[in-house]
Amino acid sequence: MKQFIDFIPLLLFFIVYKTEPRAVDILGNSYTFGGIFSATAMLIISSVVVYGILYIKQRKLEKSQWLTLVACLVFGSLTLAFHSETFLKWKAPVVNWLFAVAFAGSHFIGDRPLIQRIMGHALTLPAAIWTRLNIAWIIFFLFCGAANLYVAFTYQEFWVDFKVFGSLGMTLIFLVGQGIYLSRHLHDTTPNTPKSED
C-alpha cells in the first residue's frame, strides 16, 4: 500500500506532463498548464500534500519518504527557479544512489544490514542470506540510478515515461525475483544473528 501512495505524486506529474500546454487564467494572471514545468510544480505540491497527510496520520515519515520528499523539493525547486529540466533529471539517479550508500553503509554501521532492519520483524533468515539480500538491493539501486541517468540524457523524448513506469517496472521485477529467492529459505529457522563472512 505504501508503494502505491508514494506513486501518487509521480502519476500526477506524468498526467500534467502529457497534457497539451495551454494558457490558464488564475486571478487575472496567465499561467501555462501542461509540459515539464507545470508538471514539476504539480510534483512538488502533490508530494507535500501526500507526505503531509501521511505525517499527520502516522505522526512520522519513514527515512526513505523524507529523502524522497526533500529530493523532490530541492530538485523540483531548482528546475523551476532556473527553468531547466536538467535538475529534475538528476533527481532519480541521486535518490537511488543515496539509497545504495545507505544500504552499503549498514554493513559497517550497526549490527545488522539495513534490509534486515526493515524486514527482520516479518522474516527469520540466516545472517548470510540477509547479507546477500542487502547486497542485491545495493546493486539494484546503483543500476536504477545509472539507468535513469542514461535514459534522461540519451532518450529525452521519453525519459519521463521511463522515470514513471520504467522505474516501477524494474522495481516489480526485482521484488518478484527477491520473492522467489526468499521462498527457498523461508523454512530455514537458523537464527538471524550476524556472523562473519567465510
Swiss-Prot record:
GO terms for cellular component: plasma membrane. It comes from the Bacteria. The chain crosses the membrane at residues 36-56, 67-87, 90-110, 133-153, 162-182. It is a multi-pass membrane protein. Its main location: membrane. It is found in: Cell inner membrane. Keywords: Cell inner membrane, Cell membrane, Membrane, Transmembrane, Transmembrane helix. The keyword Metal-binding does not apply. Plays a role in cell envelope biogenesis, maintenance of cell envelope integrity and membrane homeostasis. Belongs to the YciB family. This is Inner membrane-spanning protein YciB. It comes from Pseudomonas syringae pv. tomato (strain ATCC BAA-871 / DC3000). The lineage of its organism: Bacteria, Pseudomonadati, Pseudomonadota, Gammaproteobacteria, Pseudomonadales.
